[in-house]
C-alpha cells in the first residue's frame, strides 16, 4: 500500500467558526477546550510506518480548529522532528490567529523553528462576504485575509488557500 500523507489530529472537535457543513459543529466550552492526552508511543509507531512508506508530508489537522490548542501543536512538532519529514503542514481556518496575533506570535515563531513549513487556510470563497457568512455569521466582517497572509509570510511560512467547495460560493 502506498501512502501519500501522514495526518495527525490535533485538539478536539471544538471550533469558533460556524460552518453549516461541519462534521462536528461543536462550539468551545469548558470540557472540549481541555487538551486530551496524546499517545506518544502510537505516534512514534505511525511516524516510523510513514517513513518506511516514503511519506514526505505531515498534515496537522483537526475535527475542530487546531489553533485553539497551540501548546499541543508545539508538542506534536517537537515529537515529529525525529522523523525528518521535509514538509509539515497545518490545516486551519486561522481565525484565532487573525483575531489575536499577539497571543500567537511566539507560537508561530516556535512552530517555524520546529519544522512547520506550510499553513493551509480553509476558505469557501474568494469573496470576504461569503467567507464571513459561512465562518463568522455573528460577526460584522470576515478576517482580513490579505493581512493574515502577509503576517504569516513574515515568519517564513509557505501558504495555501484550501477551498471547501460549496455550491454558489466560488466565482466561475
Enumerate the language-model features and the residues they cover.
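Conserved glycine-rich "GG(E/T)P / GGGxP" loop and the immediately following alpha-helix
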Residues: 31-89, 93-172
Amino acid at each position: 500500500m502506498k501512502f501519500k500523507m501522514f495526518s495527525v489530529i490535533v485538539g478536539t472537535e471544538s471550533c469558533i467558526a460556524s460552518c453549516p457543513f461541519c462534521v462536528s459543529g461543536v462550539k468551545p466550552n469548558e470540557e472540549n477546550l481541555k487538551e486530551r492526552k496524546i499517545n506518544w508511543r502510537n505516534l512514534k509507531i505511525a511516524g516510523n510506518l510513514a517513513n518506511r512508506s516514503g511519506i514526505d508530508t505531515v498534515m496537522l489537522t483537526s475535527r475542530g480548529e487546531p489553533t485553539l490548542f497551540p501548546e499541543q501543536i508545539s508538542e506534536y512538532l517537537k515529537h515529529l522532528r525525529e522523523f525528518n519529514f521535509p514538509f509539515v503542514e497545518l490545516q486551519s481556518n486561522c481565525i484565532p490567529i487573525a483575531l489575536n496575533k499577539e497571543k500567537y506570535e511566539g507560537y508561530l515563531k516556535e512552530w517555524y523553528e520546529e519544522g512547520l513549513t506550510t499553513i493551509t487556510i480553509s476558505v469557501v470563497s474568494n469573496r470576504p462576504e461569503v467567507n464571513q457568512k459561512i465562518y463568522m455569521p455573528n460577526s460584522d466582517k470576515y478576517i482580513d485575509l490579505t493581512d493574515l497572509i502577509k503576517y504569516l509570510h513574515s515568519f517564513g511560512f509557505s501558504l495555501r488557500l484550501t477551498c471547501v467547495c460549496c455550491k454558489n460560493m466560488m466565482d466561475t
